[in-house]
Amino acid sequence: SLGNFKQKNVVNALSEGCGFAHLSGHGSPGMWMAKDFTEDPQGKYLLGLDVYHMPLLSNKGEYPIVVIGGCHNSMFNATFLGSLIGCIKSLTGNPTWYWMPIPECFGWWLVKQPGGGAIATFGCTGLGLGTVGDSNHDNIPDSLQFLLTWLELRFFEVYAQNGISILGQAYG
């Protein structure tokens, strides 16, 4: 982060419209976050976007395909009651995937926004698979070379370099 990674800046950037968006980071059914390693070697969580700020998206007519890299961001069986119970459990010392009550998951909220949001989203319905460090000492972060982020980046590679423009074929 350059120190300006804030939720309002994410909303503003997406509201400008784009063809694709890659939200790489961490998440829950109701929010997506990035990590800032500049001040903390373990990484400090920075809120990128939550479902309650999605109605502020105003990219009408320019709806991107959004690839979401975070755990549970596309957990399609999220419900308000389930998330409320999950939040209560978390507050009483039994952590769950929910950090706030939500009626539907992050991925679906992006698609269903009138006048903003996305035309399609791809994301994890459960835990994502990430890694940190540089285990093979090639000066390329493992997060780019392995597991979930590697898969996400292959989608863009297949689209851009292989010319596959049918969404299901590009992601499959």
Enumerate the predicted regions with their spans:
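Cysteine-dependent hydrolase recognition
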Residues: 1-172
